[in-house]
Every structure is written in structure tokens, then in C-alpha cells.
């Protein structure tokens, strides 16, 4: 009986936490699906295809395109 109560409380807590931390529950999925559909129609728009600078290449601290971190204008 105690285990059942603990499980119910845990499920309710996790459900409430999911709704509380959601970005935009009103149209979040609609935007997500439209972005995914756009990326399927235009593969160049996918963020997975973006190039990043490798280790030791020059970078801008504010607009970093490094694969790792940009420290003192050099990618690490």
C-alpha cells in the first residue's frame, strides 16, 4: 500500500514538473513540427549541417562557431 502511494506521488510530481518546465505548452509542438518539416524540405537549414571551427582555429568570442570553446579568440 505504501509503495503504491509513493508511486502515485512520484508520477504526479514528475508530471507537474514536466508541465512547469515546458517552454511553451500552447504551440510548442506545432512549432517543433513545422521546423522539422522545413528542415526536411531544405536540408541546408538543418543545424546539424552547420560547420564549426576546429582546435586552434581563430574565432570571435561573441559569435563563436567553435566545435568546443572559444578562449582568447582561439578554438579549444
From Swiss-Prot:
Any one Pfam family match given in the protein's UniProt record, by short name: Conotoxin
Domain of life: Eukaryota
UniProt GO MF annotations: ion channel inhibitor activity; toxin activity
Main location: secreted
Signal is among the record's keywords: yes
Tissue: Expressed by the venom duct.
GO cellular component assignments: extracellular region
Cellular compartment(s): Secreted
InterPro entries according to UniProt: Conotoxin
Proregion positions: 23-50
Cysteines engaged in disulfide bonds, as pairs: 52-66, 59-70, 67-75
Presence of keyword Metal-binding: no
Annotated keywords: Disulfide bond, Ion channel impairing toxin, Knottin, Neurotoxin, Secreted, Signal, Toxin
Cleaved signal peptide residues: 1-22
UniProt record similarity statement: Belongs to the conotoxin O1 superfamily.
Domain commentary: The presence of a 'disulfide through disulfide knot' structurally defines this protein as a knottin. The cysteine framework is VI/VII (C-C-CC-C-C).
Listed name of the protein: Conotoxin Vc6.3
Annotated organism of origin: Conus victoriae (Queen Victoria cone)
